[in-house]
Amino acid sequence: MAQEAGDMDDGQVSDSDSDMTVAPSDRPLPVPKALGGDCGLRPFQSTATACAPASHYRTVKSVDSSEESFSDSDDDSSVWKRKRQKCFNTPPKPEPFQFDQSSQKPPIAGRKKVNNIWSAVLQEQNQDAVATELGILGMEGTIDRSRQSETYNYLLAKKLKRESQEHTKELDKELEEYMHGGKKTGPKEEENGQGHPKRKRPVKDRVGDRLEMNYKGRYEITEDDSQERVADEISFRLQEPKKDLIARVVRIIGNKKAIELLMETAEVEQNGGLFIMNGSRRRTPGGVFLNLLKNTPSISEEQIKDIFYLENQKEYENKKAARKRRIQVMGKKMKQAIKNLNFQEDDDTSRETFASDTNEALASLDESQEGHGETKLDAEEAIEVDHSHDLDMF
């Protein structure tokens, strides 16, 4: 203690008062501890709590600086400015920063996208491209529905369109089978008129593309040639598929007249051809040939009837079969109507109304049963008639 007292300079006080008279420059700075240590150890505290010791230090510092001289070192002033600037210039943070790398900031609920339409469109296009690739591979892609009602699921639209087209094809196929009576008529049957379509087909389907006449032909024909040779050459030049009809023409009117009609047909075709009766289309070369045949005075009506007898007979049979089908359908409808109606004994008006239709329907059903080519009715559908006077009741 004596050595320590001897080492003291003039003006120093004793050890008991040393704690009260320590110079401000010799005091330890609490700011680094408060700012460095506390902020590092407690990252989840608010900024105001971390800066509270710094505010206390600033107050003490301002009081002490008024009493002491301005002989402090430049190092102390630089430290003071740096600490003060760091404390008061730090912008307030709404949330403390988390040092954990695995943690992510949760999205704010109710936040709307502002001025984000083009980026959304670009993102949707990229998703569409990915969905297309998945569709090619047989997988289903997910469509972005962030645009809610404006979202267009084109994958679903393509799928629905494909299903609709397949369904339409099936309906067309069923209708085609129904129109042809459950079987497809071949081209030969259509040419010979053996097909019984329920609807008149278009001209291109019935006649086909219009073929131009072959004026030169394969070889020259004369009156001395055989009828088969002349008929075959005329059919070739006219591009006529009904060769049997041309053969009958040559057989009935002769080689000379048939060759003359062929020359007249070639002249008419070179001048533009002939139209049909309604003027909707031009006649085929074979049609021009047959039209000239009918309008030639030197050819009698008996010859024309003999030439077109088979064609007229086929047309008549087709019309008769169509009429039978219509009557048969009407008869079935009448039977169903009669079964569903309950006539009263004194109701004469309703009985007279259905009497004629019922008789016609029953007659048509009897004719259809007699015909070998027509379909027969079931036993359940037949009307039971015990006596002949039962028909008069209707």
From Swiss-Prot:
Phosphothreonine carried by residues: 296
Gene3D superfamilies: PHAX RNA-binding domain
Domain of life of the organism encoding this protein: Eukaryota
GO cellular component: Cajal body; cytoplasm; nucleus; ribonucleoprotein complex
Biased composition (Basic and acidic residues): 178-193, 369-394
GO molecular function, one term: mRNA cap binding complex binding
GO biological process per UniProt: protein transport; RNA stabilization; snRNA export from nucleus
Residues spanned by motif Nuclear export signal: 130-139
Keyword 4Fe-4S: no
Keywords: Acetylation, Cytoplasm, Nucleus, Phosphoprotein, Protein transport, RNA-binding, Transport
Family matches, as InterPro entries: PHAX (IPR039047), PHAX_RNA-binding_domain (IPR019385), PHAX_RNA-binding_sf (IPR038092)
Residue numbers spanned by region Necessary for interaction with CBP80: 2-329
Disordered: annotated segments: 1-109, 178-208, 365-394
Modification after translation: Phosphorylated in the nucleus. Dephosphorylated in the cytoplasm.
Keyword Plastid set for record: no
Residue positions, PTM N-acetylalanine: 2
Localization, UniProt: Nucleus, Nucleoplasm; Nucleus, Cajal body; Cytoplasm
Annotated region described as Necessary for poly U RNA-binding and snRNA export, given as residue ranges: 279-287
PANTHER family: CYTOSOLIC RESINIFERATOXIN BINDING PROTEIN RBP-26, PHOSPHORYLATED ADAPTER RNA EXPORT PROTEIN
The protein's assembly and partners: Found in a U snRNA export complex with PHAX/RNUXA, NCBP1/CBP80, NCBP2/CBP20, RAN, XPO1 and m7G-capped RNA. Part of a precomplex with PHAX/RNUXA, NCBP1/CBP80, NCBP2/CBP20 and m7G-capped RNA. Interacts with NCBP1/CBP80. Found in a complex with snoRNA, Interacts with NCBP2/CBP20. Interacts with DDX39A; this interaction stimulates PHAX RNA binding activity.
Family of the protein in this entry: Belongs to the PHAX family.
Protein name: Phosphorylated adapter RNA export protein
Organism whose genome encodes this protein: Bos taurus
